[in-house]
């Protein structure tokens, strides 16, 4: 599903410039046809029981900034978002959620390419940016949560995708800092991640209904998977050790309604045995760190290539 197509990037700016900006223009921007119920029927018949539905929201949180743009790039600084989700976009997201739920599968609905390396990313793991965008982020999740507050446990909300620091650092915060790793900058990024996660939980729970106990997914910095058997940096586990599980009011029979997410990509395809050992070492590392958190872990993305 390409509800995560990022129209703020130069390659997709044609959506804003030359069309009526209907949901299908975004949905097909990366070459995929309009999503139909048959797609999820196929997944169900193939044995899948859960679908992650990635959605990028920023092109649909206020249209004035695109109409005023004269360049082929969008700047979240010069053309700020209003935060009001376009009803047509929310309706389309709702339709696809229903496609999934109707197959009796779990649906994980998220905020996707509002994060990442795109020039349009407005969710940045940075203390100053968090303070600036906290109200906007809260407003977005409040609207999503209100839209689906009566849905049952098959619908899960995911806070954000791969949120990066101001240096677009992967693997751990401040990896790409000019002059090398900065402890101050790294801590600022990790604190921002923790604040975003807590804000997400608070916003959803405040809407009531079934959101009071809905299962919620929070993600590590950049969705990092930590160290494996190639410990090339002492900072690889920081996205884990610096992560603080949000305070949450939802507890059933002593169990929290929170899930932690990481992503895992293995780039070495030349030696399958080495790739296998790397994956096993990653899982072993996860097991050694997270039992104390007492919440499940999911691998929301995985693959042999980026």
Predicted feature locations:
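Short, solvent-exposed loop/turn and secondary-structure capping segments
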Residues: 6-7, 63-65, 119-120, 168-170, ...
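A general, composition-driven signal for non-globular sequence regions
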Residues: 8-11, 15, 46, 106, ...
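A solvent-exposed, charged loop/short amphipathic helix patch at secondary-structure junctions
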Residues: 7-26, 69-80, 171-185
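Active-site loop signature of alpha/beta-hydrolase-fold enzymes
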Residues: 3, 58-60, 114, 165-166, ...
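Short, solvent-exposed beta-strand-terminating loops
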Residues: 1-13, 59-65
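Extracellular glycoside hydrolase catalytic/binding regions
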Residues: 21-24, 138-142, 146-154, 160-306
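Short intrinsically disordered, low-complexity coil segments enriched in acidic
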Residues: 1-8, 51, 297, 306
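An active-site-proximal structural segment forming one wall of the substrate-binding cleft
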Residues: 22-51, 55, 59-61, 65-159, ...
């Amino acid at each position: 599903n390409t509800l995560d197509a990022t129209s703020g990037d130069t390659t997709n700016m044609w959506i804003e410039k030359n069309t009526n900006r209907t949901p299908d223009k975004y949905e097909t921007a990366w070459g995929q046809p309009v999503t139909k119920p048959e797609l999820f029927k196929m997944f169900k018949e193939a044995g899948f029981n859960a679908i992650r539905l990635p959605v990028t929201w920023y092109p649909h949180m206020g249209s004035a900034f695109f109409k005023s743009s004269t360049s082929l790039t969008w700047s979240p600084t010069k053309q700020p978002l209003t935060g009001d989700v376009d009803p047509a976009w929310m309706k389309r997201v709702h339709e696809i959620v229903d496609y999934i739920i109707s197959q009796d599968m779990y649906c994980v609905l998220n905020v996707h390419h509002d994060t990442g390396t795109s020039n349009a990313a407005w969710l940045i793991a940075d203390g100053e940016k968090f303070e600036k965008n906290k109200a906007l982020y809260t407003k977005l999740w409040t609207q999503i949560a209100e839209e689906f507050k009566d849905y049952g446990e098959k619908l899960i909300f995911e806070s954000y995708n791969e949120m990066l620091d101001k240096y677009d650092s992967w693997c751990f915060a401040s990896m790409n800092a000019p002059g090398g790793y900065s402890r101050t900058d790294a801590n600022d990024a990790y604190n921002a991640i923790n604040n975003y996660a807590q804000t997400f939980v608070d916003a959803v729970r405040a809407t009531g209904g079934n959101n009071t106990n809905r299962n919620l997914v929070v993600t590590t910095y950049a969705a990092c998977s930590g160290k494996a058997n190639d410990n090339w940096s002492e900072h690889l586990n920081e996205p884990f050790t610096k992560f603080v599980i949000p305070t949450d009011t939802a507890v059933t029979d002593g169990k929290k309604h929170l899930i932690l997410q990481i992503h895992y990509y293995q780039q070495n395809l030349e030696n399958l045995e080495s790739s296998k050992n790397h994956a096993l070492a990653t899982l072993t590392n996860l097991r050694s760190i997270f039992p104390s958190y007492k919440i499940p872990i999911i691998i929301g993305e995985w693959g042999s290539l980026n």
